A protein has these predicted regions:
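Extracellular glycan-recognition regions
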Residues: 1-229
């Protein structure tokens, strides 16, 4: 079986390393960084994106609204199914730095509050900011390390179904815990803070940014200009 990282203790699992020799792939290639930001101008998702579960083509489209990623809601029956930790159609991206800011523009058709566009930091402890199709911004937390639940912290009516959502990683306590700040804007310039939360790594990998549309079957949201700085 392959061993991840280095086999520091023979017979046990490998451990991560800061540097590793590149494999011989038959040619020389320049060192490049893994992409983070995405303008969704391609007709294929970049390799930096990972689905929470085995993906389905009906979960997203890069052609319905060119220059945007359209994510569709799944027909999930219970409240617990719609918790982000349990959501299969969650599009995620591993963190590439200990501090950074992720911002995305979201828009969706007006509705009655059954669907919402989500920007999240997902892990065993997580948080997210979402815009509902009623024009309400929500800030929610989840804890699947001890409590196995998700709850709303606060919400605010903004009167529009188009807004900018932002998550800022402001500090890392250690390799497993970090603090994040949640905010939103209706014009892309003036961001209003909704609070801060503590996040944790996932079960097998570190914390990740995540995008999703949560709600009823047939609902959708468009995401554009995903920017990480």
């Amino acid at each position: 079986w392959p061993v991840m990282g280095e086999n520091a203790d023979t017979g046990l699992c490998g451990q991560p390393v800061m540097r590793c020799k590149k494999p011989n792939v038959g040619a020389e290639y320049p060192i490049t960084t893994i992409p983070t930001s995405d303008d969704f101008s391609s007709d294929k998702l970049g390799l930096q994106w990972q689905w929470q579960a085995n993906n389905k083509e009906e979960w997203y489209s890069l052609t319905e609204n060119k220059g945007s990623l359209r994510l569709y809601s799944e027909d999930l029956k219970t409240k617990e199914d719609k918790y982000l930790w349990n959501l299969p159609n969650l599009l995620t991206q591993l963190w590439q730095a200990p501090s950074m800011v992720a911002t995305v523009k979201v828009s969706m058709p007006k509705g009655v509050g059954n669907n919402k566009a989500v920007l999240a930091v997902i892990g065993q402890k997580y948080g997210y900011v979402a815009l509902s199709d009623e024009g309400i911004v929500e800030y929610c937390n989840g804890n699947f390390k001890t409590d196995n639940r998700e709850w709303k912290v606060t919400d605010k009516c903004v009167g529009t179904t188009e807004a900018y959502l932002r998550l800022e990683v402001i500090s890392c306590t250690n390799s497993k815990v970090a603090s994040c700040r949640v905010s939103y804007s209706v014009d892309g310039s003036d961001f209003i803070s909704l609070g801060e939360f503590e996040c944790m790594q996932g079960k097998w990998v570190g914390a990740k940014f995540a995008l999703a549309c949560v709600g009823e079957k047939g609902g959708y949201a468009d995401f554009s200009n995903f920017l990480v700085v």
